[in-house]
Every structure is written in C-alpha cells, then in structure tokens.
Regions:
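Auxiliary tRNA-acceptor-end handling modules of aminoacyl-tRNA synthetases
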Residues: 1-185
Length: 185
C-alpha cells in the first residue's frame, strides 16, 4: 500500500486504486511516457507517443467511470444557452470499473486498475500514430504491433501528493519479432 493523492494497493498480482469521493469530478491529466524500449526505430525513451488526456472520475452505486473531458467548446454558465449547451456536451466514458470495496469510513471507493493501465488502449501504446503523409509520399510507415496481453502487465506503482505513476511492461510482436516497451502512466 502506498499513499498520496489516492491510495494504491497491490493484493497478490492485482493493483487497486482507492479513490476518495473528494477527487471525483476533479479534472486530471492522464499521460503515458516511454521509460524504456527494445527497438527505438520510431520512438525513444522519454518521449510521449500521444497527447495527454484531460480526464475526470465519477461514481454511482456500483461502478466508477473514467471520463475524457472535451474542452474544445465552452459556454459561460451565465449565458441563457448554458443549460442546453451542457446537455449536448457531456463527457464520454472511456472506461468503467466495478467497485471492489468501499473504505471503512465510506469516504472512498476501491477499484481494480492494473488491467486497465496495462491494456492496449491508444493512450498507453508506445507506437506513434500513422502519418497520413507517409503513405502519400511513399515514406516508411510507423511501427505497429500485435499486443501480447499474457506477457504484459504492471511492474510497479507509486503515489505522490499530486499524482500517481504506474510502470507497465507492454509486449508486442512487431514484424514477427518481440518488442517491449516500459511505460510510465
């Protein structure tokens, strides 16, 4: 167990996050950075292959939802169109997590997050997006790979006063060869 902005727990081979209700609806950044890599043809350690996502958490009786926040259009809450604008601009759910437990004082919920952070979702992938110009000009395409879930997973976790880190090992098959990236999420 490590404590910080949220409390993180490791039980056997599962990783849990204890989210206080006080952080629900607070906007946060979700980002992944390459920490180590077995083939640096397209990307090197230290680089972020994808832009960070602005996220927020919400909870209901049986699940916690992770929403992506879209700030591309905003409306002043004092404007007469604000209620209609808000109904047509809800934050989409990126992932939902069943509530595994509730803290003894009912101030937080516990969810299993290891399988999410070590998944082959775009924000966590070590590969750059394919360039539409590469094909047009006959340039080399970006590396892509087939995810090997059974060989991938969380390596470690850390909690700090203002953020948390999960270190993951992401294993792929690229051009019939093994490829491994360690990511810090």
């Amino acid at each position: 167990t490590v404590r910080g902005l949220v409390t993180l727990h490791k039980v056997k081979s599962k990783y849990y996050m204890e989210l206080p209700y006080s952080v629900m609806d607070a906007q946060m950044l979700l980002a992944a950075r390459v920490s180590g890599i077995s083939n640096n043809r397209d990307i090197i350690a230290g680089r972020m292959p994808h832009d960070p996502l602005l996220i927020r958490w919400s909870a209901d009786d049986d699940k916690v939802s992770l929403h992506t926040v879209d700030c591309s259009a905003v409306c002043d809450s004092a404007e007469s169109i604000a209620p209609g604008f808000e109904r047509n601009k809800i934050d989409p759910v990126m992932q939902a997590f069943p509530i595994a437990a509730v803290s003894p004082d009912s101030s937080a919920v516990v969810i299993e997050v290891g399988s999410f952070f070590a998944s082959d979702q775009k924000p966590f992938r070590p590969f750059l997006d394919a360039s539409p110009l590469a094909k047009l000009f006959g340039l080399r395409e970006s590396m892509q790979g087939k995810f090997q879930k059974e060989m991938s997973g969380v390596v470690s976790m850390q909690a700090f006063p203002e953020n948390v880190n999960f270190r993951t090992r992401m294993v792929y098959t690229v051009y019939d060869h093994p490829f491994t990236a360690e990511m810090t999420v």
